[in-house]
């Protein structure tokens, strides 16, 4: 069984999270400049087995795609071309940044660390992945 990778793609930075080998727990892996994500993922899959990429689906409250969704779709097209052997799925990422900030606050991180946008992106990827895992658990 391979890992599941979650990707919180942004125009500047991208948060990445991965499951454990049993696909039960999500952990933050890295925040990568968005132009380097596909290379980072290619390197990652050369070291670790990966079964699936889960990409944050950017939607507005009315369920319409957000303005940034076009960048996410372009990234996913590039990812699928570069790594065609691993399927890609989307998962709703609404409120993940808010939840990430809340988790950081509740975790007692100092203000300077909470302002680290890269850390917010990585935690957002963890939240996307954990929510995806929870949704699959209840479909069994």
UniProtKB/Swiss-Prot annotation:
One of its GO terms (cellular component) is cytosol. HAMAP family: Nuclease_YqgF. Pfam families: RuvX (PF03652). Its main location: cytoplasm. Keywords: Cytoplasm, Hydrolase, Nuclease, Ribosome biogenesis. Could be a nuclease involved in processing of the 5'-end of pre-16S rRNA. This is Putative pre-16S rRNA nuclease. It is found in: Cytoplasm. GO terms for biological process: rRNA 5'-end processing. The lineage of its organism: Bacteria, Pseudomonadati, Bacteroidota, Bacteroidia, Bacteroidales. Its EC number is 3.1.-.-. Transmembrane segments: none annotated.
